[in-house]
Amino acid sequence: MVLSKSHAKGGKDMKKMKRVVAMLLAVVMVFGLAACGSKKSGDDSGKEEKSNYPEKQITLICPLAAGGGSDTISRLFAAAMEKELGVSVVVENKPGAGAGVGLEAIASSNPDGYTIGYIPAEVTTVEAMGNATVTPEDFEYICTAMKISALICVPADSEWDSLDDLIAAAKENPGSITIGTAGVGNAYELGLRSMLEAAGIELNIVNFSGGTAEAITAMMGGNVQCCTAGTAEAISYVNSGEFKVLCNLSSEPSELLPDVPTATELGYECNGGSWGAFAVPAGTPDDVIEVLRKAGEKVMNADDFKKTLSEKGFDEYHVDGAEFKKDAMEMYKTNSDIIKEFNLSAN
């Protein structure tokens, strides 16, 4: 059979068209597989990045000296977090400048989750005091750790049995009664000054650079007539009968000393309590913060951890890490105003 030229040409065109279609299908398949592979790879890498943290040792910076309440809570937390995270958590103390040195070190550390920090209430005062440039805004909070009520204490043989007794004596002899406190601008002193202003009295405030321990020693030695102290520092003296507690300068009663009235309840509004939290520097990835928050929540809610806190003189304090930043910033603004009002300074 002999084909016409037009029929032969049509056959060639048909073959050519099939080859083009086949090539196009091949290209589509190649790009489709590549896209799927890329998507799968991207998903896997994201999951892998999340699941891999933490992979190495974590450093926990405590901005206050070894041996104190902040150091104690930092070491308790580090040991518990090791069990939750499966890596070593090592505490490094960086005291100085009213916690300013350590807070600056935490805020300026690499925001990769391998440096976390204990954040004391001083983060709300160090800037106004001139000790550092950090504020609560420079951190993302893992969890709150505890709170410490600020107390006005006197020796067991003191003539004063209540805050009203102290106020009456101060009104009779303005500025003659001495009270020791743990350094200029500390949370206890700020609460004390607010209470004195509300009561309309004046005490001779003696600041001790050695902290609350030095103030207690001075009171027990008769060098000052009363002192401010946190529950963690005072509880053993109270239990042994060496101290009387006239009032709690915090806004709420202490779970450890529920029968001690707050100054606010007595009509003299103030909030001189201290607290502690754990945080990472601002800019830390959200997935890393999430891992730390979940672990921190487990630690803080564990019964054995709560029991240890109570034994050490700390009250429980649970505020969501994400929400706590707002609370801390409010405290920062309030304390900054008090520091300016009373012209307090580290210098």
Predicted features by range, described:
Residues 72, 76, 80, 84, ...:
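Extracytoplasmic/secreted proteins, especially bacterial periplasmic and envelope-associated proteins
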Residues 108-114, 128-214, 275-308:
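Hinge/capping helix and adjacent helix->loop/strand transition within the periplasmic-binding protein
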Residues 47-138, 176, 201-225, 316-318, ...:
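N-terminal (or domain-start) structured segment
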Residues 1-59, 345-347:
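Short, low-complexity disordered leader/linker segments with a strong preference
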Residues 29, 58, 67, 74, ...:
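Residue-level signal for nonpolar/aromatic packing positions in well-ordered secondary structure
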Residues 176, 180-184, 188-260:
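Ligand-binding pocket segment of bilobal, Venus flytrap-like solute-binding proteins
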Residues 55-57, 197-198, 203, 287-347:
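An extracytoplasmic/periplasmic, membrane-proximal ligand-sensing/linker region
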Residues 233-301, 333:
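C-terminal lobe and pocket-closing loops
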